[in-house]
Amino acid sequence: MIRRPPRSTPKPSSAASDVYKRQADSIVINPHKWLLTNFDCSAHFVKDPEALVRTLTILPEYLKNNESENIIDYRDWSIPLGRRFRALKLWFVIRYYGVEGLQEIIRKHIKLASQVEEWINRSGNFELVTPRSLSLINFRFLPEQNGKFLDIDELNLKLLNELNDSRSVYFTQNRVRGDFVIRWSIGQTNTELRHVEDAWIQVQKIASSLN
């Protein structure tokens, strides 16, 4: 019998703290992945913008104008001279949700992933292959072999394929230290606890049918 997992409220955590930011010279994020922005949109933060501009700037005569020395020209911040106007859609998202609204969504997803992490650790026949990273989990089905040989990689590949073929959930694959694992990423805007619970029940149900 597959039981609905008990609910708990683990405290969410985030690696995006000032401690980590100070260790980086540049940070690139994709708002189209976790900030509710339509594809495509990337944001680039640099500690020393002048170093980036010195590296990439070109100024032939035909690009000069009266304001060349007085403005920030973002063509000097990347290899292509031109780009689509991606900033406006991100601006609208930030204006609508605000920083606190976006933080709330991200923290909710991290909290949901923390719940999944707890279920996996308590399951007995699933293994958390790496520590959870924000809302990303790498896990695999690791049942008791009871004297019979099991190809764990092949078993998890079959589990992944059957989960995705069910069309009720979708996972991706990964390899960690050579082992085949299933990659569970929580980041869809409208994901709620009930969706994650249903996904976990589906994982257990299909895994039980394979063992």
Please describe what each predicted stretch is.
Residues 128-163:
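Conserved PLP-binding catalytic core of the aspartate aminotransferase-like
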Residues 33, 96-99, 143-145, 188-192:
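A generic structural motif
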Residues 92-93, 138-143, 182-186:
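Short, hydrophobic beta-strand segments
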Residues 22-121:
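Active-site C-terminal subdomain of aminotransferase-like
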Residues 1-16, 20:
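Single conserved hydrophobic/aromatic residue that forms the stacking wall/gate
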